[in-house]
């Protein structure tokens, strides 16, 4: 069997930074360090950090006064920020800088009196954080093409859209086309909000799909970008499965497969790829790299955690 490894795959710069913030905080302040929500959507990462002293909570009211508290890479609402400032907590913000860029964009649009539309998945932590940057009526969520037709805006001439950073590039493009058809003067982001890593990993999967009989995507079931990778593979004509680790692979999937493509979501560590290759006895197969681009971006840590 031929095995194709997508490049790029796995951790993006925002995930690298978020995990490093937790590790540096543990090193500097000692455990326990509290993290609001999963720092990134990956069970292996969460358990690895939990074993080192990180405590994951749903809300800030679960954190004792005086503790170190970290916001996850997905970002938080203004209300959560205000609660963190009100409480005697030592706050560290691991929000991805590209998510933070979308937050600032929403604020600027609101300041300029635009009705803001957010294209994203309802219930996702990033969407909840972005929606929470403005008062409720000032931002509307578009999760499905049908939502566009149902929009009722007080001033259709003064409308702008932003997007969740981890969406399918192709599906978002189609939804944007619908918005433009309904609101010809709609204001677009100065630069596309879907992050570089999401786009790069989807492009790599498109290339994998052309060359593979089956694609395995390593990632968590609640990871938006990992789910999109599986969907992109299927939309480009290739069978695909989202798996959390090598144990999820079912032997019948591999029957008749001559070329297997492997990739990993932006929150999936490379060790999971290595374990999958070992599980497949990769040394007995032809393993190749399928590269569509290289990534060199890195985000700095908060000042107090820099060495």
UniProtKB/Swiss-Prot annotation:
Protein name: 4-hydroxy-3-methylbut-2-enyl diphosphate reductase
Binding-site residues, (2E)-4-hydroxy-3-methylbut-2-enyl diphosphate: 41, 74, 124, 165, 223-225, 267
Cofactor: how bound: Binds 1 [4Fe-4S] cluster per subunit.
Binding site for dimethylallyl diphosphate: 41, 74, 124, 223-225, 267
Listed cofactors: [4Fe-4S] cluster
Enzyme class, first EC level, given as a word: oxidoreductase
GO BP, one annotated term: isopentenyl diphosphate biosynthetic process, methylerythritol 4-phosphate pathway
Disulphide-bridged cysteine pairs: none
Task performed by this protein: Catalyzes the conversion of 1-hydroxy-2-methyl-2-(E)-butenyl 4-diphosphate (HMBPP) into a mixture of isopentenyl diphosphate (IPP) and dimethylallyl diphosphate (DMAPP). Acts in the terminal step of the DOXP/MEP pathway for isoprenoid precursor biosynthesis.
Presence of the UniProt keyword Metal-binding in the record: yes
Enzyme Commission designation: 1.17.7.4
Chain sites annotated for binding isopentenyl diphosphate: 41, 74, 124, 223-225, 267
UniProt GO MF annotations: 4 iron, 4 sulfur cluster binding; 4-hydroxy-3-methylbut-2-enyl diphosphate reductase activity; metal ion binding
Family: Belongs to the IspH family.
Keywords per UniProt: 4Fe-4S, Iron, Iron-sulfur, Isoprene biosynthesis, Metal-binding, Oxidoreductase
Positions bound to [4Fe-4S] cluster: 12, 96, 195
Catalytic reaction equation(s): isopentenyl diphosphate + 2 oxidized [2Fe-2S]-[ferredoxin] + H2O = (2E)-4-hydroxy-3-methylbut-2-enyl diphosphate + 2 reduced [2Fe-2S]-[ferredoxin] + 2 H(+); dimethylallyl diphosphate + 2 oxidized [2Fe-2S]-[ferredoxin] + H2O = (2E)-4-hydroxy-3-methylbut-2-enyl diphosphate + 2 reduced [2Fe-2S]-[ferredoxin] + 2 H(+)
Taxonomy of the source species: Bacteria, Pseudomonadati, Pseudomonadota, Alphaproteobacteria, Magnetococcales
Domain of life assignment: Bacteria
Known pathway: Isoprenoid biosynthesis; dimethylallyl diphosphate biosynthesis; dimethylallyl diphosphate from (2E)-4-hydroxy-3-methylbutenyl diphosphate: step 1/1; Isoprenoid biosynthesis; isopentenyl diphosphate biosynthesis via DXP pathway; isopentenyl diphosphate from 1-deoxy-D-xylulose 5-phosphate: step 6/6
Keyword Cytoplasm attributed: no
NCBIfam families: ispH_lytB (TIGR00216), PRK01045.1-2 (NF002188), PRK01045.1-4 (NF002190)
Record-annotated active site: 126 (proton donor)
Pfam families to which the protein is assigned, alphabetical: LYTB (PF02401)
Organism: Magnetococcus marinus (strain ATCC BAA-1437 / JCM 17883 / MC-1)
